[in-house]
Amino acid sequence: MRRALRLLPLPLSIAICLPAMAADKPLNWGLCPAVDPLPGFDGAPAADPKAAEMRQQLPTDIEGDQLSGTSTTPQYQGNVALKRGDQFLGADNLRMDTETGNYIAEGNVRYQDTSFRMVADRAEGNQDTDTHKVTNIQYQLVERRGNGDAESVDLQGQVGQMHRSTYTTCDPSQPIWRVRAPEIDVDNEEGFGTARNAVLQIGKVPVLYFPWFKFPIDDRRQTGLLFPQFGLSGRNGFDYLQPIYLNLAPNYDATLLPRYMSKRGFMFGTEFRYLYEGGRGEVTGNYLPNDKLRDKDRGSVFYSGYHNVNSNWQARSSISWVSDTRYVEDFTSRINGMGSASSLQSTVGIYGTGETWTAGLMADRWQLTDYTLDEQALPYNRQPRAYFTWEKPLGIFEAGIYAEAVRFTHDDSYFVRPPISGSSRDDNEDEYVRTNIRNKQYGSGARLDVKPYISMPLSGAAWFLTPTVAWRYTAYQLDSTLADTAPLTGNRTPTRSLPIASLDAGLYFDRETSLFGTNYLNTLEPRMYYLYVPYRDQDDLPVFDTRPFTFSYGQLFRDTRYTGADRQNDANQLTLAVTSRWLRQDDGREKLSLSAGQILYFSDSLVTINNSNNSAAGSEQTVEQGKSAWVADANYMINDRWSMGATYQWNPNSRKEDLASLRTRYLLNNDGIINLAYRYRRNLTDNSDQLKQADFSFLYPINPSWSAVGRYYYSLLDRKPLEIIGGVQWDSCCLAVRGLVRRFVRNRDGEMDNSIQIEFVLKGLSSFGQNTDRTLRRAILGYYRDDLYLVPPSNTTTNPDDYDPNLIP
């Protein structure tokens, strides 16, 4: 009797065909009716994934109101039900012939399992020849909300054919979109289907026609077309990308990425991915022959991958290359991270980690991607870099060491020829390209930096005390070109060694209190940090990768004010800071936190990076005896929806603020949000205003279906916007449409660009158009509500392979 259930998987062919192209990101089904298109059937087993996995080993039970016929031709009548595990098949009548293998089920034929439901008028076939036919079908995917119908389904073994079938995720009474196909061939053994003359309808209007296409019906990948992406911008014109997926092997595949830009021409791209037991990788390449705007060939190559050597060691690489310094500007449209977009980093290395140690051997190289700069702005290449760290408790002590050896090289910088008189850079870009006439040679050198330390962390219920003593030794081996560069003294093997001593101590007080009828736990957390580092003259040391840290609250508790090992500031200073928090006792949420601190300098700090060999290192003010700027941070949760935050630095020497930022956020219903921020920074070198910006962004739900989105990012210094976004979103049970208009600064010269982005999301099927989610998630903090509580990887700029003890407070 178990073979009688052979017909049960047939409707799954319909169920899996079209939704196999569904989007990976979570979908919002909140606007869908609570009632399923096909409610669960009476008498059907409850959904049970475990039973679904075991169904082939379970027996089949059959029941009905009446049983007639003979032992070879039984007939079941009235409420016929077949059950096996999570499967249920019901019908009004079931006739069988055990000698010929024929069967007929008719009258209210219905089927249900954990993921699928179906009703049909009639099902008939032959178990021996494994041929089946089901007529007048309606079905529903329980988890995906997909539903539709088919006039009939024919099955011969593992090959089936559906006639006049449809698919949608909409309410059947109001199908905003649906896919119709007069004929779909399904091969369950090979795992693919072939649709002919399929049409995507929005309402009753056909919008896409597919004369023939193949698609997967299970998790096995299949070669075929992916949904296109298109957009419109002032730089590229009409932009159309048609991905073509190639399933080359179970462990590697490729995607062809032909792209047409009306103002530039055809770009040919490809993406290749591979996967094996010990690692994976991905390489992407693009080539644009004879760009119509630039009159030259353009291209790029990107690779990333890793290989697990063993449980402790992993090899990783990330390679980036572009054909010219305008490539990033012309083919990307990000406004955030413009500084990082001025260069591309390529790295390759092997990295290890253990219970008490980390180590690595790597090399990197930088490429300039901003035509407004020259190679002097590039960081030094590290070719190679080796590092080792070790840290372990030893009784009441904790000992550790950080060691690094690096060979630094730099691409020679070239001068830029002046423009032709009366012309612009865009008109004569060739006159601006870098030539082979060298203006300056940076030279190269090697550096060894070793920093052993020992500390004694002591703590109690309301206090902690951690004295630490370290010794830092740094040695260089410079080539003559670099050693003879001013202001270096010609010494090719300079060294520096010095002790570092610190004492970190703090107290913790708390009390129970109430405010406006709410009970709180109020804390007071004073902290003291003393640092002593003797002065060493470091003017003969080059500057390779060292910059001053941006002064912040965390900087109050570090033993150096530099990132990198080329400078170690002298210090005789004491940090005094305090933090106070108000924590709600009923749920532990922080209502208010206030932090403030200041460094007291008992003597001048004479070490600076001024007058170094590296012009890109910038300059800094000498730290004089006295007091640092006051640093204050505050966060206030007005209620569960409204929060405010502020950071403020006030300099008692200049009696001016060095930095100020204010931000507020209001959470609306239906995942709406409003953000408002102000940022100010003063240039400490010449006391001029360095940055003054206002930023307003929102996702405002007008009603459950409509919402407005926007951003206005404005520079008060330049008196011009940096980015303007305006758009609307329409959402329904099964369809979402987003339209954006965007104006943004596209380069350091302040030139503006415009773009229009439109995206259609057919829920449970796919999306086409430009990826507006990426733009809105970057521009509107909280567009994805989870981003308020998690740090998105795209927003972190620290390279995990660049361990630096100076970054650890």
Swiss-Prot record:
InterPro entries for the chain: LipoPS_assembly_LptD (IPR020889), LptD (IPR050218), LptD_C (IPR007543), OstA-like_N (IPR005653)
Any Pfam family matching the protein: LptD
Domain of life of the native organism: Bacteria
Signal peptide interval: 1-22
Locations listed in the record: Cell outer membrane
Main location: membrane
Disulfide partners: none
Record's keyword annotation contains Signal: yes
GO aspect biological process, one term: lipopolysaccharide transport
A GO CC annotation given for this chain: transporter complex
Record keywords, A-Z: Cell outer membrane, Membrane, Signal
Quaternary structure and partners: Component of the lipopolysaccharide transport and assembly complex. Interacts with LptE and LptA.
Function: Together with LptE, is involved in the assembly of lipopolysaccharide (LPS) at the surface of the outer membrane.
Family that this chain belongs to: Belongs to the LptD family.
Protein name: LPS-assembly protein LptD
Provenance organism: Xanthomonas euvesicatoria pv. vesicatoria (strain 85-10)
Gene name linked to the record: lptD
